[in-house]
Amino acid sequence: MILTNHSLIGVALTHKSIQYSIIFLIALGSHYLFDMIPHWHYRTPSIKEAVNAPFGKRTLRVSSAPYDEIMRIILDLTVGLGLSLYFFSASPMVIVVGVAGAVLPDLLVGFGRFYPIRVLVLHDRFHKWIHARHMLDDWPLIGITSQIIIAAILVFLLR
């Protein structure tokens, strides 16, 4: 699922709460729950591997400049935050905490590409394990439409 959808779903489920820890944990859990549903992703293929370098630094091998992918992720995150602020009347802090919890798992996967430390590798394995086995990446019309429908239903029902 794209970050916009995870943001909207996480905030839809938590915007009426005032306990930041509860908001964060429910939004975090929603990420894993909704990743079980077949969905579409945009690709981020340019980062191939991280290798050890002198003095413990990581050196990335990339197939192309990853700036387009990074900008796509930033735009996706910004749209999700903006739509969450638009649709829900909760305090901005509640919305930011909900968005943060909802998108953290995908951001951890991304950080794991840069810094493949044990905790991030274990998280990546768990994230892949819990993920839907059937992906809609090759059917963007179906995948994107299904994500819009899921987010719209939750926004409408929980607003």
Predicted regions, residues:
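N-terminal membrane-targeting hydrophobic helices
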Residues: 1-159
